Amino acid sequence: MAERGLRKVRVGKVTSDKMDKTVVVSIETSEKHPLYKKFVKRTYKLKAHDENNECKIGDIVKVMETRPLSKEKRWRVVEIIERAR
């Protein structure tokens, strides 16, 4: 059997849990501005599969890349690192 390539793993915060078995995760990165050389925070959102509807808004979660599960879902929740208070 051929080995599978490394899958991307990201850590982010759940910003929406209104969908069934799906959460929206916001991931914040900082990158250097090409002209001004200042570090700028950028936030991007992705939809992740949450099989048991365990995640709530504010949870810190680890997501892993997976096969396409729907039109926009290509990530799944691996673990909940920290629960929201």
UniProtKB/Swiss-Prot annotation:
Keywords: Ribonucleoprotein, Ribosomal protein, RNA-binding, rRNA-binding
UniProt keyword Ribosomal protein, yes or no: yes
One BP term from GO: translation
Cellular component aspect of the GO annotation: cytosolic small ribosomal subunit
GO MF annotations in UniProt: rRNA binding; structural constituent of ribosome
Keyword Ubl conjugation listed: no
Pfam families: Ribosomal_S17
Domain of life: Bacteria
Residue stretches spanning the membrane: none
Cystine connections: none
Family: Belongs to the universal ribosomal protein uS17 family.
Protein role: One of the primary rRNA binding proteins, it binds specifically to the 5'-end of 16S ribosomal RNA.
Subunit structure: Part of the 30S ribosomal subunit.
Record's protein name: Small ribosomal subunit protein uS17
Species, as recorded: Acetivibrio thermocellus (strain ATCC 27405 / DSM 1237 / JCM 9322 / NBRC 103400 / NCIMB 10682 / NRRL B-4536 / VPI 7372) (Clostridium thermocellum)
